Amino acid sequence: DLMKYDSKTKGNPYLDEDFKNGKLIFKNGKKYDALLRLNVSEQKFEIKKNIQSKASAIDIDESVTVKINDATYKLHSFNLGTKSNLIGILKECLVLDKYALYFFPQKKIEMPKESGIASPSTGYSKAPQPEWKDNSSFIIFHNGKTYQLPKSHKKMMELRLFDEKLYKKYRKANKLNLKNEESLKG
């Protein structure tokens, strides 16, 4: 069954609200074509046989690969320096010998930031509505460890994943944007 969400919340819990043509690929070689979308708040895929059919949520495990357009998704267990592991569906961005870069799609519900401007006193003020906000990040797997990619170059250097001089040179030459997948893939 699909999760029901508060209709008063602005936005949606999906990476992309529309169902896209995709494929479930199982370790045993079986493949299944379907319409898919990722519910990032539940970390589940929602699946339809065709546009008219009813959607249902599916759990995947490490033996299933999901392809939607050119993107590849898999369930991973990883640790970002806390006591317990996280389990999440990650989008494969770039896999090299020593490094692997993944996108970890996440959303959270937040109350909108209050503006400092006082509204005129009409005796009625509309209560602020909660909204779905992007909380995604990039993850690097390196030497058996997992790192959440910071949004600043200074914090990136503090991770000590790369030679500082080479990183600075590469960053300047390629106008590296730590928030952009295409920029990160080089």
Label each residue range with its predicted role:
Residues D1-P13:
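Sec-dependent signal peptide cleavage junction
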Residues M3, L149-P150, L166:
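Generic signal for short, ordered secondary-structure residues
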Residues K4-D6, E17-D18, P120-S121:
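Short Pro/Gly-enriched beta-strand edge/turn motifs at strand-loop
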Residues T9, K20-L24:
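Short boundary/loop segments of OB/S1/cold-shock single-stranded nucleic-acid-binding domains
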Residues L15, I25-H153:
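Aromatic-patch recognition
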Residues F19-K20, H142-T146, L161-K165:
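Short amphipathic alpha-helical segments, especially helix-boundary/capping motifs
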Residues E158-G186:
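Long, compositionally biased interface segments
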